[in-house]
Amino acid sequence: SSIYSITVNPSPIVQFSSADQTICSGAATTAVNLSTTTVAANISWTCTVLPGITGAATNGTSVIPVQTLINTTNSPITLNYIATATTTGSAACPGNTATYSITVNPTPMVSANPALQTICSGASTSISLASLVSGTTFSWTFATSGSITGASNGNGNLISQALINSSFDPQ
């Protein structure tokens, strides 16, 4: 009779140093360190860059680096970084994949309708604000202009303010 020795390597599990991230377009992500529950393991990751995103890294090893991501669309885009750990040694055992996500929200562009408005003193403005980015909220501030009164900071998608010109000149 013979005695055989069999070594069973544990299946490595990838762990991420921080929770998934959500950023605004043009902002930098934070670096994410990848580790594993198994001491002797190599970690690699890949990311498929989706249309509408620039600045994304596509592959690496133990760190998802700082990236300045730009979303050129009007909708949020989520990048998924798929990581795998593989034990080292004579029996290299891959673990299950783990996914880390970074969502990049678009930069809303504001349109005003009408873009230019002329009113009589005492009349109200009626300027509608819109954006193609769903969920956009609007706020505005005003700059004091000579003898115009009635303007105020505000928020919402309609600027409606009764403005008074106490001078004899258009302003």
Located regions from the model:
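Extracellular low-complexity Ser/Thr/Asn/Gly-rich intrinsically disordered segments
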Residues: 1-171
